[in-house]
């Protein structure tokens, strides 16, 4: 085995250098990007990306997954031709997808609620131009309000229609852990029979991998892991601030990742840049990082932190501009 670069810092030392002070950086930007506002892009701070340098992880089912995944919640917008509002710029979306695929990205993550409900359609139109077997498409059961069985199943089928596919590679119970905790989880997925339906869809092959994304109560996280259900993956918020200093309703990523790793459940990572804040550190922290690796962007440190953990399958980035 080759020796590691002597200049490479351990994660522990890196955490000591950046510390929790990184959390005080600029505010995050969410939702689809407004026209002419590229600041919401996480990719724009990474610099030039080599075409042949993508890292891939192999899932327990043998899928070759790009370590960088495309989060499709911030598609660029343009003025609507017949109204005062904005619509997704499909030509721009196509260009972004082309660039991502050319650089090795094959995992695309969306939801029925992203971009005011239009992300799946735009994502599906862009991806339809490529061989389906070359792509890994992830979307979600985002039944936050009307979670009857009928409405939830309708949402599931509508997702496949919008994405122009007859199967989903990765399907998630969206944002588990909020509301009234375990009660809300039961209302959304158990008492209405929706989880049983999705398990049957996985058995039939229309869902290749079934998992959930987590925000909120650690009791709900532990509860889902205790169920007699084989989860293929779980999506968690993980970055070097949230690792041990999660704020608000979030749980320390060190705990979340550790619980998944010891069960052999792959982790998909969201918010590696904490909504963009970890690309905008204060001058003191930037200087310390540049002293170690002057050629690397500030954001690249955050991506490397998330991507170096062996049980991480994919690190998502919401990219509006490249």
How should each PLM-predicted stretch be described?
Residues 93, 119, 152, 156, ...:
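Aromatic/hydrophobic pocket-lining residues that form the small-molecule binding cavity
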Residues 134-145, 171-174, 236:
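A short, structured active-site edge motif that brings together acidic residues
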Residues 152-172, 200-204:
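CE4/NodB-like, metal-dependent polysaccharide N-deacetylase domain
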Residues 86-99, 148-162, 217-224, 299-302:
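Short, acidic/polar
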Residues 2-135, 166, 196-197, 203:
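N-terminal binding-site loop/beta-alpha segment at the start of enzyme catalytic domains
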Residues 69, 107-109, 169-172, 211, ...:
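Conserved beta-strand positions in the central sheet of alpha/beta enzyme cores
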Residues 74-90, 141-149, 288, 292:
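Active-site mouth loops of central-metabolism enzymes
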Residues 12, 46, 51, 176-322:
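Beta/alpha (TIM)-barrel catalytic core signal, keyed to glycine-rich beta->alpha loops juxtaposed to Asp/Glu
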């Amino acid at each position: 085995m080759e020796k590691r670069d002597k200049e490479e810092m351990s994660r522990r030392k890196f955490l000591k250098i950046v510390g929790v002070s990184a959390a005080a950086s600029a505010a995050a930007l969410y939702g689809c990007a407004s026209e002419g506002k590229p600041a919401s892009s996480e990719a724009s701070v990474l610099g030039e990306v080599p075409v042949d340098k993508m890292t891939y992880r192999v899932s327990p089912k043998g899928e070759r997954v790009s370590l960088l995944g495309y989060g499709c919640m911030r598609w660029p917008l343009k003025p609507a031709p017949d109204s005062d509002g904005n619509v997704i710029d499909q030509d721009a979306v196509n260009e972004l997808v082309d660039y991502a695929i050319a650089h090795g990205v094959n995992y695309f993550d969306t939801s029925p609620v992203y971009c005011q409900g239009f992300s799946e359609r735009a994502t599906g139109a862009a991806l339809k131009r490529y061989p389906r077997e070359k792509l890994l498409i992830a979307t979600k059961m985002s039944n936050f309000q009307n979670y009857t069985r009928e409405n939830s199943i309708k949402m599931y089928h509508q997702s496949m229609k919008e994405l122009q596919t007859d199967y989903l590679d990765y399907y998630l119970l969206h944002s588990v852990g909020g509301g009234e905790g375990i009660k809300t989880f039961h209302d959304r997925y158990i008492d209405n029979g929706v989880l049983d339906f999705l398990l049957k869809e996985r058995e039939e092959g229309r869902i290749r991998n079934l998992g959930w994304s987590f925000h909120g109560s650690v009791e709900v996280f532990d509860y889902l892991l205790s169920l007699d259900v084989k989860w293929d993956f779980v999506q968690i918020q993980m970055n070097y601030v949230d690792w041990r200093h999660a704020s608000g309703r979030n749980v320390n990523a060190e705990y979340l990742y550790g619980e998944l790793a010891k069960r052999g459940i792959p982790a998909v990572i969201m918010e590696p840049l904490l909504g963009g804040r970890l690309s905008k550190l204060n001058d003191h922290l930037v200087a310390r990082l540049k002293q170690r690796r002057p050629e690397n962007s500030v954001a690249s440190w955050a991506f490397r932190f998330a991507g170096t953990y062996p049980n991480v399958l994919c690190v998502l980035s919401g990219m509006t501009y490249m």
